[in-house]
Amino acid sequence: MGMSEIAKAAQKDKAIGGADRDSHTPMMQQYLRIKAQHPDTLLFYRMGDFYELFFDDAEKAARLLDITLTTRGQSAGTPIRMAGVPFHAVEQYLARLVKLGESVVIAEQVGEPGATKGPMERAVSRIVTPGTLTDAALLDDRIDSLLLAATLHRGVLGLAWLNLANGDLRVMECPAEQLQAQFERLRPAEVLVPDGLALPLVESLSPVLRRLADWQFDAGNGERLLTAHFGTRDLAGFDAEGLPVALAAAAALFEYARSTQRQSLEHVTGLRVEREAEYLRLDAATRRNLELTETLRGEASPTLFSLLDSCITSMGSRWLRHALHHPLRDRGVAAQRHGAVGELAGSDAGAPADIGDARMLGAVRAALRGVADVDRITARIALRSARPRDLAALSDSLARLPQLHAALGTPQAPLLCDLLAAIAVPDNALDLLVRAVAAEPAAAVRDGGVIAPGFDAELDELRGIQSNCGEFLLALEVRERERSGIATLKVEFNKVHGFYIEVSHANTGKVPDDYRRRQTLKNAERYITPELKAFEDKALSAQERALAREKLLYEALLEALAAHIPALQRIARALACLDGLGAFAEAAVRHSYVCPQFSAQPGVDIIGGRHPVVERQVEDFISNNCRLAPTRRMLLITGPNMGGKSTFMRQVALIALLAHVGAFVPARSARLGPLDAIFTRIGASDDLASGRSTFMVEMTEASAILHGATEQSLVLMDEIGRGTSTFDGLALAFAIARHLLEKNRCLTLFATHYFELTRLNGDYPECANVHLDAVEHAHRIVFLHAVEDGPASQSYGIEVAALAGIPGSVVREAKRRLRALENREVGNGPQADLFAALPDREPATPSHPALTALAELDPDTLSPREALERLYALKRMTA
C-alpha cells in the first residue's frame, strides 16, 4: 500500500468503524488514522521494543538507513511491507534521517497492555524536523539549528526565526532583495514559506523547505499568539509593533514549533526584534569571500572561525560563530568587548597582548572546563525531555560557578562586571539538583538509579527491599538446609522464573511437604514455598513500584526546575559570552593581536596589518599598512598574480570586521572610522543552479555594491571586468571605478591588471596608486608581498604561468607575442584584430646561428651530458 493508497483509505473511512476500515486489522486501522494526519512524514510506530515503519515509509527508511525491508502478514488483502529500528538505538537513526533532511513523527504506546479491547493505544509524542531539534544526539554542539519562516508583502521581506534548542526567538523586516544575504547570515536548518508564494531563490538556498497554508501567515494571529504566550497586552515592550510582515511569519513559525513539540514553549521567554542598522551589512558574497566560517570550497577549515575557536564550551563556540556573522554597528558595545578581552589577556589598550600577563584568562578557562551545555539543557528541561545525565551535568556546571567567580575576582571592565553578576549561583536550583540527582545516574529513568538516596523516604524503602534481597535469600537457604537436611540445597533467582529453591534429583525425596514444583531440569528440580512466594511478590512489586516512584519524582523534579528557567538562561548566555571573549583573548595572546581604536574621523588606518588565517599557513608573512581617508578614498592596487593583492584586501576587511565583533586585530595598530557595511567582489565561478555565467555572477555582485555602498562602506573590488573581452572589461572597470569615486564615495580597495586605470589619479586625487612588487632573480620570479606606493611596472603573468608548469614552448611563444604587442600601437580598432593582425613570426632580422640555436634550447629537458654537448656545439658556432 503506497502513500496514495493510504490517503484514499483515510478519505474513504473518516468515521471510526466504517465499512472500509473493517477491511484492515485493528492495528492497521490505528496506524492509518495517525499516518493520515502526517502523510508527508516518516512515521515511527512503537511496537514493543521496536519502532516500526510500514508500506512506503518502510521502503524509504530501508533505503535511507540501510535496514532490512520485510513483509509480514496482510491487511485488507495487501501484504504489509515493514522495517524497524530498536527503541534503545532510535536516536542514532533519527540523527541520520535529519541529516538527510527528513522529518519523523514518533507515535508512542500510551496505554497499558490489556487495558482496552483491541490494540494498545498510541499517540504522537513528538515530531522531529531539521529545524526543531533539541536532543543532544541530533544536534551539532557548535552550530545553532534555526527554524525560519519567511513571507513577502509589497517588497518587504518578513522573517521570524527560532532556536528551539535555547528558546531564542527573533523577527525582522527588510527589503526583499536582502533575502540571500539574510539566509547566508542565518543559515536556517528548515524554512517555512506560504504555499502561494513564489520564491525560487529560497528553494536553492534552503536544504529543507516546507510550504504551509497561506492563512497561517497572518499578522493578527501572530500578535495574538505571542501576546498570549508572553502574557502581555501587546508587543510594545518588545519593540515589535508596526512589523506586520514579520509578525505574519512569526505566526506560522510559532504554531509550527508548538505542533512539533506537542506542548507550550515555556523556555521562549522573550522576543527580539533585529534592525538592519544593528550590524555592519555583509552580503552573501562577502560572507563567502571572507571565509568567516566556511572556505570557498565548502570546508570548515582553514577559516576565521576555525582559527579563533579555542572555546572551552560548545555554548562559547556558538556565541563566537554568531558574533563573526554579526559585526556590531554600535561601537560602544564593541568597545566594551575590547575592554573585556584586554583585561582577560592582560593587555593595555593599543599594546599587543602578553602571554605572561594573561593570568585571569588562564583561571577563567580552567574554571570553564567541565561546564556542560547549560543553554540546551535548560531548553530540554522546559520541554520535559531532559535526560538524567543532563541534570547531573547541570548540577556539576552550577557547582563550578563559584570557581569562575574567584577567577574573575573584581574585574575593571564593565562587561566583565555584568557577566560576573549574571552568573550568580541559583542556590535553590543547585541545592535541589544535588539532593535529588544521583552522582552517576542511569542514561534513562526507566533504568532506575536516577534519584539520589535520601531524597525520598518511600523510594528508599522500596529500594531497601530490593537491596536486602540477597541477605534474605542467604538466610532462607541456611534455614531450608537445616529444615530439609539437604546440604546442597540452593535458593536462587533468574529473570525468567523468579525465585526458586533448587534440589538435585538424588535429594528430591527429602523435600518438605510445602515445597511446590516450579521447574524440572535434567539433574535437578526447582521448587517454591509459600514464604518464598510471598517474598517474591513483595520484591518484584517493590522493583516495579520503585521505578514508578522514581519516574514520578523525576517528572516533579523537572517541573520544579522549570521555575528556574529564566535564571538558567541568563547564566547560559553569560557563560557563552565569557567563553567567546576568552577565545578572542586567547587569540590575542597567542598571535600578538592589538586592541583596535575607533575614531569619529572617516577612514581606515592600519599599520603592520596581517591576514589572520594566511599568516598561520605560511612562514615569514609580510605585514602591510593601509590608509584610507576622505582625501584617499580609493587604493588602486596593481601587481603580479600571486603577488598578494587579494590577501592584502581581505586582511583589511577582516581587521575591520574583527574590530566590530569586539576582538583584537592582527596589526601593530588599527584605527577605524565609522563603517556601515563591508562589500567584496573577489573571484567568481559559474552559478550553474541559477543559470548564471562567471561574468554574470561578477556583474551581479558589482551591481549590488554600486547600488548599496555609501560613504561609510568598505568596498573590495578584485579584478573587475576580467570575465569578458579585454576592451569590454577595461571599459567596465573604468566606469565602475569612476562611479565608486564620484557617486558612492566609499572607501575602496580596487585591484586590477588594467594598467590604464592607474591614470585615474590624474583626474581624481583621492585615488592613490599602490602595488605589490616582484623581482626576477636567477631567471625566477620572487614575490615581495609588500605594498608600495605607485603603480606596478608589469604583471609577470607569463612568469607565473611558467611556475604553474606551462610547457616551455608555450611560455616562449607567449613571450614572443607579448614583445610584439608591446612594440606596436594597438589603436582603437576592434579587439579581434589584436592577435589577427600579428604576423605568425616576428619580422625577419639577421641573427647569428648560435643565438637561434640558443633560443630553441629548453634547458629543463636536457640531461647533464646533453647540456654539455650543446654547449660545445654553441662554442663551435662562435669559433
From Swiss-Prot:
SMART domains: MUTSac, MUTSd
Top-level lineage group: Bacteria
Nucleotide-binding is among the record's keywords: yes
One term of GO molecular function: ATP binding
Biological process terms in GO annotation: mismatch repair
InterPro entries cross-referenced by the UniProt entry: DNA_mismatch_repair_MutS, DNA_mismatch_repair_MutS-lik_N, DNA_mismatch_repair_MutS/MSH, DNA_mismatch_repair_MutS_C, DNA_mismatch_repair_MutS_clamp, DNA_mismatch_repair_MutS_core, DNA_mismatch_repair_MutS_N, DNA_mismatch_repair_MutS_sf
Cysteines joined through disulfide linkages: none
A GO cellular-component term linked to this record: cytosol
UniProt xrefs under PROSITE patterns: DNA_MISMATCH_REPAIR_2
CDD domains in alphabetical order: ABC_MutS1
Positions bound to ATP: G639, P640, N641, M642, G643, G644, K645, S646
Functional summary from the UniProt entry: This protein is involved in the repair of mismatches in DNA. It is possible that it carries out the mismatch recognition step. This protein has a weak ATPase activity.
Family classification: Belongs to the DNA mismatch repair MutS family.
Protein name (record): DNA mismatch repair protein MutS
Organism, as annotated: Aromatoleum aromaticum (strain DSM 19018 / LMG 30748 / EbN1) (Azoarcus sp. (strain EbN1))
